[in-house]
Amino acid sequence: KTDVPNWLAKNVDKFYSASGNPKPKKLSAKVSFDELYDKFLSERKLGEGRKRHYEVLRRMIHRYESYVKCSQGRVRYSFDVVKVDKGLLDNLYDYIENEYEYVETYPRILEDNPEARDIKPRGENYMSGVFKEVRAFFNWAYKNKIIDSFPFEGFEMPSEQYGSPVYLTLDDVDVIVRADFSDDKELEIQRDIFVFQCNVGCRIGDLLRLKKRDIINGAVEYIPTKTIKERAKTVVVPLNAIAMSIVEKYKDVPGDQLLPFISSQNYNENIKTILEKAGITYLVTKLDSVSRTEYKVPINEMASSHMARRTFIGNIYKLVKDPNLVSALTGHAEGSRAFNRYRDIDIDMKRDLVKILEGKH
């Protein structure tokens, strides 16, 4: 009696040996989204901040799975990377953009996937950031032959749109420096730290980590944590007289911290109070990222640690419009598009331009 399986296996082997063609690999069992996502993240050089962003996306995918189960009755549904196409991407986009409504309609979504923060309406800027991460994952899957086709072919990526960056003028900073905070010593300390940040331009995470030993030959030296795994480049920012005077003022602070920092959340709240107390409360124009409409808001109400970084970049870029030169002081990648938003003509230059027309009348 012929053993059919063995006979078949031997003859299949003979066929591929004779033809010179490689024998197809045996298909492996279905790999879950989470397993693939873990592998994707393990192969990426991501800082802690970027990792957190990708983990937010993972949780969104899990909630999308629950949404499909609830809305379509597909109780066994799971997000199968191999089956994702443009149509599914459109559905995923709709879910993430309108998730705040879907979790109200289907409470089971959050029961199965508890989320600490409230889910709010999301605009195109947010969606653009999320889908850049989705695309990066599928690009990795395609390059590693996990999927046969790239699902983003024909998919229209959302566009980012930002208003002009809002930052303090040098006169504003001077007013803050001269403001009297003698009645609130804690606020005075935070004022000094904010002014220091306006003069060195580092991100809040790097600011909080600065140590006394990071001041070398009259300059602050640090490696930005946001890009340390992708581009471990030391940023060197010479300290001007204002920054140096603040370092000198707090040189006897116990421990190795450069300045007496507090938590970033309290720091941001204090910055708003600092501007208000200094009288920096004029209105500025902001763009609502959800409705894409502009609105006015007092500058102190939108002030934060990132405004200090924008103040550093904006005021230097007005004088030296060389992105590569400025990026050497900020830690941006060379050729970064982040500086495109700072190319607005200064208001004083605009006044000079329109004065040209006065001679025509």
Which sequence ranges carry the predicted segments?
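N-terminal helical hairpins
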Residues: 1-50, 60
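N-terminal core-binding DNA-recognition domain of tyrosine recombinases/integrases
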Residues: 38-49, 58-164, 179-182
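Short, charged phosphate-coordinating catalytic segments
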Residues: 139-149, 197-219
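Short, basic (Lys/Arg/His-rich) helix/loop patches that form interaction surfaces
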Residues: 182-184, 252-257, 272-328, 332
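Conserved tyrosine-mediated DNA breakage-rejoining catalytic core shared by Y-recombinases
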Residues: 200, 209-248
